[in-house]
Amino acid sequence: WSDPEFAAEVGWKGDPVATPNLDRFAREATVLTEAVSNFPVSSPHRGMLLSGMYPERNGVVLNCMSERPESSLREDAECIGDVFSAAGYDCAYIGKLHADFPTKNNPQRPGTYVSDAVPEWDAYTPPERRHGLNYWYSYGTYDVHKHPHYWDTDGNRHDVDEWSPRHEVSKAIEYIE
């Protein structure tokens, strides 16, 4: 759980809340009671989750921003999406990426950053840098969660007037269906 306050609020831990799927998962799987990131910084941690490699190997050694082009997920890094896609799975990425440095590659305004307000942080990830993830609905680091924006698979920008976690869950359900 990302918030330790709510970690005990599941049925299998005795809480009265109904969590039948999590309860079944806890019975049938291994429950880890503690986890530690060996690099608890946004971009490097995301790079490790995607690639299974330490930051020094995957290229994401610092938080990704335009002033740090050396910190970005290597194009030749084999990531989980590459592996699953090569095995025939349909792969999606929905939400914040923050593992690729921003460049002047705005699909709607070529030669410009995607954000005039925060060009050093926000990013559009072109298809060749998506590591086997064929369905795309993501952004770099635009943390206005009540009014987020995303780029879809084709590079179209979507400005949303909905809390980002709720919207991303809706997009995930839409993708799965």
Please give the residue ranges for each predicted region.
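Formylglycine-dependent sulfatase
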Residues: 1-177
